[in-house]
Amino acid sequence: MKKLLTAAMALMLMLFPLAACGDGDDGVIRLNEVTHSVFYAPLYAAINLGYFEQEGITIELTNGGGSDKSMTAVLSGDADIGLMGPETAIYVYLEGRSDYVQIFGQLTKRDGSFLVGRSPETDFDYTGLEGKEIIMGRRGGMPAMTLQYILNQHGYYDGQNITMNYDVQFNLTGPTFANGTGDYVTLFEPTASQLVQEGKGYIVSSIGKASGEIPYTAFMASKSYIQQNGEKLQAFLNCIYKATQYIMTHDNDEVARVLAPSFAGVRPPWEQASF
């Protein structure tokens, strides 16, 4: 897990002016995350360790269930900040919006999902996927594009020698696979381990290890919000960085116990198959 989190060490602000927080600011940040996963451990650690509270920030966290939905929340004003794939900011910019969305901090530098199959494959190799159907997620999203890149690198092309299924919404990929669709699916934790525990799947590969480093998940907000809340966003990133330092200097059991309150009803992270 810690290898996937080292990207947070490189958190940085984009090159734009930071304005002071407006008068009467209550310190609340409404944050919509693309999915709820231990992949974003620094965020939950910062919440549970009280780092945001120390900075006078209150996080109101909601789960978008996909980058498209998280971006919709930001654009509609239902969320102040979105945590999602950077491609969504590009899509919005290309629409020609005047108050477009900007990335102000990077959280991860790899795909954090895992390829899940229907049988255990201790010696899994991407060269053995010819003729298989893989549930990719939403076309144009980071999970789908990253997996497509891996498959293309191994000579697979949709409709020629493999089926890349883009018809399933991001937050329904796990249940759809569990119900019998596809031979493989890409899933984040804790969903991947939940399927393993239910006997409905087996983790066979780390997508992030196979794809290499890419700017995968980032914090973003509208240009106007960033201009009006520069100091608050800097304090927000400071908390994320501080939580990252905690994770990098404590053992897995300690980190898992810090994360546990953010995953009520879920088997402890240290018992998950990919931990």
Residue ranges and their predicted role:
Residues 1-28:
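Short, low-complexity disordered leader/linker segments with a strong preference
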Residues 24, 217, 236:
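Glycine-rich, positively charged active-site loop/lid region within alpha/beta enzyme cores that binds
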Residues 27-169, 176, 183-189, 200, ...:
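Short, glycine-/small- and polar/acidic-enriched structural segments
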Residues 114-116, 218-221, 225-226:
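Short glycine- and hydrophobic/aromatic-rich loop-to-beta-strand nucleating segment
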Residues 132-137, 179-182, 224-227, 242-248:
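Second-shell loop/turn segments in exported
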Residues 191-192, 209-211, 225-226:
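Short, catalytically relevant binding-site loops at active-site mouths
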Residues 195:
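Short helix- or helix-capping micro-motifs
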Residues 227-275:
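Secondary-structure end/capping motifs
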